[in-house]
Swiss-Prot record:
Organism: Spinacia oleracea
Keyword terms of this UniProt record: Chloroplast, Plastid, Ribonucleoprotein, Ribosomal protein, RNA-binding, rRNA-binding, Transit peptide
Lineage, highest ranks first: Eukaryota, Viridiplantae, Streptophyta, Embryophyta, Tracheophyta
Entry-linked InterPro entries: PSRP-3/Ycf65_sf (IPR038447), Ribosomal_PSRP3/Ycf65 (IPR006924)
A Pfam match: PSRP-3_Ycf65
UniProt-recorded name of the protein: Small ribosomal subunit protein cS23
GO molecular function: rRNA binding; structural constituent of ribosome
Entry annotated with the keyword Plastid: yes
Complex and partners: Component of the chloroplast small ribosomal subunit (SSU). Mature 70S chloroplast ribosomes of higher plants consist of a small (30S) and a large (50S) subunit. The 30S small subunit contains 1 molecule of ribosomal RNA (16S rRNA) and 24 different proteins. The 50S large subunit contains 3 rRNA molecules (23S, 5S and 4.5S rRNA) and 33 different proteins.
Biological process annotations from GO: translation
Family of the protein in this entry: Belongs to the chloroplast-specific ribosomal protein cS23 family.
Protein backbone atom coordinates (compact mmCIF):
# COMPACT_ATOMS: atom_id res chain seq x y z
CA UNK A 1 0.00 0.00 0.00
CA UNK A 2 1.41 3.37 -1.01
CA UNK A 3 0.93 6.24 1.40
CA UNK A 4 1.38 9.81 0.20
CA UNK A 5 0.40 13.34 1.17
CA UNK A 6 -0.81 15.88 -1.38
CA UNK A 7 -1.37 19.63 -1.26
CA UNK A 8 -4.39 21.26 -2.93
CA UNK A 9 -3.58 23.56 -5.83
CA UNK A 10 -6.27 25.02 -8.08
CA UNK A 11 -3.79 25.73 -10.92
CA UNK A 12 -2.70 22.11 -11.09
CA UNK A 13 -5.99 20.93 -12.62
CA UNK A 14 -4.81 22.13 -16.03
CA UNK A 15 -1.33 20.59 -15.65
CA UNK A 16 -0.64 17.05 -16.90
CA UNK A 17 -0.13 14.40 -14.27
CA UNK A 18 3.30 12.78 -13.94
CA UNK A 19 1.67 9.39 -13.24
CA UNK A 20 0.20 7.86 -16.38
CA UNK A 21 -2.40 5.29 -15.46
CA UNK A 22 -5.58 4.17 -17.20
CA UNK A 23 -7.58 4.79 -14.01
CA UNK A 24 -6.15 8.27 -13.28
CA UNK A 25 -7.26 11.11 -15.52
CA UNK A 26 -7.55 14.91 -15.69
CA UNK A 27 -11.37 14.89 -15.75
CA UNK A 28 -13.17 17.25 -13.38
CA UNK A 29 -14.34 15.55 -10.22
CA UNK A 30 -17.18 16.08 -7.77
CA UNK A 31 -15.55 14.91 -4.55
CA UNK A 32 -12.18 16.44 -3.58
CA UNK A 33 -9.55 13.74 -3.10
CA UNK A 34 -6.67 15.68 -1.62
CA UNK A 35 -5.46 16.84 1.79
CA UNK A 36 -2.82 19.08 3.34
CA UNK A 37 0.64 17.54 3.78
CA UNK A 38 2.59 17.42 7.03
CA UNK A 39 6.30 18.26 6.90
CA UNK A 40 8.67 15.36 7.41
CA UNK A 41 11.51 17.59 8.65
CA UNK A 42 11.36 20.80 10.63
CA UNK A 43 14.67 22.24 9.41
CA UNK A 44 14.58 25.72 7.80
CA UNK A 45 16.15 24.44 4.57
CA UNK A 46 13.34 21.91 4.10
CA UNK A 47 10.65 24.51 4.78
CA UNK A 48 12.10 26.64 1.97
CA UNK A 49 11.97 23.65 -0.37
CA UNK A 50 8.40 22.72 0.47
CA UNK A 51 7.17 26.20 -0.48
CA UNK A 52 8.39 25.64 -4.06
CA UNK A 53 6.87 22.17 -4.55
CA UNK A 54 3.11 21.81 -5.02
CA UNK A 55 1.71 18.30 -5.42
CA UNK A 56 -1.74 17.46 -6.72
CA UNK A 57 -3.63 14.24 -7.20
CA UNK A 58 -6.43 13.88 -9.72
CA UNK A 59 -8.89 11.03 -9.46
CA UNK A 60 -11.79 10.28 -11.78
CA UNK A 61 -15.13 9.62 -10.03
CA UNK A 62 -15.20 6.00 -11.23
CA UNK A 63 -11.93 5.29 -9.41
CA UNK A 64 -12.80 6.88 -6.07
CA UNK A 65 -13.63 3.44 -4.70
CA UNK A 66 -9.91 2.60 -5.02
CA UNK A 67 -8.85 5.69 -3.04
CA UNK A 68 -9.22 5.91 0.73
CA UNK A 69 -8.87 9.28 2.47
CA UNK A 70 -7.62 9.00 6.05
CA UNK A 71 -6.87 12.21 7.92
CA UNK A 72 -4.11 13.98 6.01
CA UNK A 73 -3.05 10.99 3.88
CA UNK A 74 -4.28 9.47 0.64
CA UNK A 75 -3.73 5.71 0.27
CA UNK A 76 -3.74 4.25 -3.23
CA UNK A 77 -3.38 0.55 -4.04
CA UNK A 78 -0.08 -0.38 -5.69
CA UNK A 79 -1.87 -2.00 -8.61
CA UNK A 80 -3.54 1.35 -9.36
CA UNK A 81 -0.18 3.04 -10.00
CA UNK A 82 2.04 0.29 -11.41
CA UNK A 83 1.39 -3.22 -12.65
CA UNK A 84 4.59 -5.15 -12.09
CA UNK A 85 5.41 -8.52 -13.57
CA UNK A 86 8.06 -10.69 -12.02
CA UNK A 87 10.55 -11.81 -14.61
CA UNK A 88 12.65 -14.88 -14.02
CA UNK A 89 16.13 -15.17 -15.45
CA UNK A 90 17.70 -18.59 -15.73
CA UNK A 91 21.47 -18.43 -15.44
CA UNK A 92 23.28 -21.59 -16.37
CA UNK A 93 26.34 -22.05 -14.18
CA UNK A 94 29.54 -21.92 -16.19
CA UNK A 95 31.75 -24.96 -16.24
CA UNK A 96 35.15 -24.44 -14.68
CA UNK A 97 38.17 -24.02 -16.94
CA UNK A 98 40.14 -27.26 -17.24
CA UNK A 99 43.80 -28.06 -17.75
CA UNK A 100 44.41 -30.38 -20.69
CA UNK A 101 47.58 -32.28 -21.55
CA UNK A 102 48.07 -32.36 -25.33
CA UNK A 103 50.52 -34.56 -27.16
CA UNK A 104 51.93 -35.06 -30.64
CA UNK A 105 52.73 -38.71 -31.40
CA UNK A 106 55.58 -39.00 -33.91
CA UNK A 107 57.84 -41.85 -35.01
CA UNK A 108 61.02 -40.59 -33.34
CA UNK A 109 59.64 -38.08 -30.81
CA UNK A 110 56.63 -37.38 -28.70
CA UNK A 111 55.59 -33.81 -27.85
CA UNK A 112 53.73 -32.79 -24.71
CA UNK A 113 52.04 -29.44 -24.10
CA UNK A 114 49.64 -27.91 -21.58
CA UNK A 115 46.46 -26.02 -22.54
CA UNK A 116 43.66 -24.44 -20.56
CA UNK A 117 40.18 -25.16 -21.94
CA UNK A 118 37.57 -22.50 -21.20
CA UNK A 119 34.04 -23.85 -21.89
CA UNK A 120 32.28 -21.83 -24.55
CA UNK A 121 35.42 -19.87 -25.47
CA UNK A 122 38.07 -22.34 -26.64
CA UNK A 123 41.58 -23.14 -25.47
CA UNK A 124 44.50 -21.08 -24.27
CA UNK A 125 47.99 -22.56 -24.69
CA UNK A 126 49.95 -22.46 -21.44
CA UNK A 127 53.17 -24.00 -22.75
CA UNK A 128 55.01 -24.84 -25.95
CA UNK A 129 55.42 -28.49 -26.93
CA UNK A 130 58.17 -30.24 -24.98
CA UNK A 131 59.67 -33.17 -26.91
CA UNK A 132 60.93 -36.46 -25.55
CA UNK A 133 63.54 -38.13 -25.87
CA UNK A 134 65.34 -35.08 -27.32
CA UNK A 135 64.94 -33.34 -23.96
CA UNK A 136 63.30 -34.46 -20.77
CA UNK A 137 59.73 -33.34 -21.57
CA UNK A 138 58.40 -34.66 -18.25
CA UNK A 139 60.91 -32.56 -16.23
CA UNK A 140 60.18 -29.41 -18.30
CA UNK A 141 56.45 -29.93 -17.80
CA UNK A 142 56.98 -30.35 -14.04
CA UNK A 143 58.93 -27.05 -13.84
CA UNK A 144 56.18 -25.29 -15.81
CA UNK A 145 53.45 -26.60 -13.48
CA UNK A 146 55.41 -25.60 -10.36
CA UNK A 147 55.77 -22.03 -11.72
CA UNK A 148 51.99 -21.63 -11.97
CA UNK A 149 50.77 -21.07 -8.38
CA UNK A 150 47.09 -21.22 -9.39
CA UNK A 151 47.47 -24.90 -10.38
CA UNK A 152 46.79 -27.09 -7.35
CA UNK A 153 49.11 -29.84 -6.18
CA UNK A 154 46.43 -32.42 -6.99
CA UNK A 155 46.06 -31.15 -10.58
CA UNK A 156 49.84 -31.12 -10.99
CA UNK A 157 50.13 -34.77 -9.87
CA UNK A 158 47.29 -35.86 -12.20
CA UNK A 159 48.85 -34.09 -15.21
CA UNK A 160 52.34 -35.47 -14.52
CA UNK A 161 50.90 -39.00 -14.15
CA UNK A 162 49.13 -38.60 -17.50
CA UNK A 163 52.40 -37.42 -19.08
CA UNK A 164 54.21 -40.45 -17.63
CA UNK A 165 51.55 -42.83 -19.03
CA UNK A 166 51.74 -41.25 -22.51
CA UNK A 167 55.56 -41.39 -22.58
CA UNK A 168 55.51 -45.04 -21.41
CA UNK A 169 52.98 -45.98 -24.12
CA UNK A 170 55.11 -44.24 -26.75
CA UNK A 171 58.24 -46.10 -25.56
CA UNK A 172 56.48 -49.49 -25.54
CA UNK A 173 55.20 -49.03 -29.08
CA UNK A 174 58.56 -47.79 -30.34
CA UNK A 175 56.86 -44.74 -31.84
CA UNK A 176 54.73 -46.89 -34.12
CA UNK A 177 51.06 -46.10 -33.54
CA UNK A 178 49.86 -49.29 -35.31
CA UNK A 179 51.52 -51.73 -32.87
Amino acid sequence: MLSMAVQPNINAIAKPSIYQSPKLSLKPFKTPAFANPKPFFSSPSFSQLKKKNNWSLFVAPETISDVAIMGNEVDIDDDLLVNKEKLKVLVKPMDKPRLVLKFIWMEKNIGLALDQTIPGHGTVPLSPYYFWPRKDAWEELKVLLENKPWISQKQMIILLNQATDIINLWQQSGGNLAS
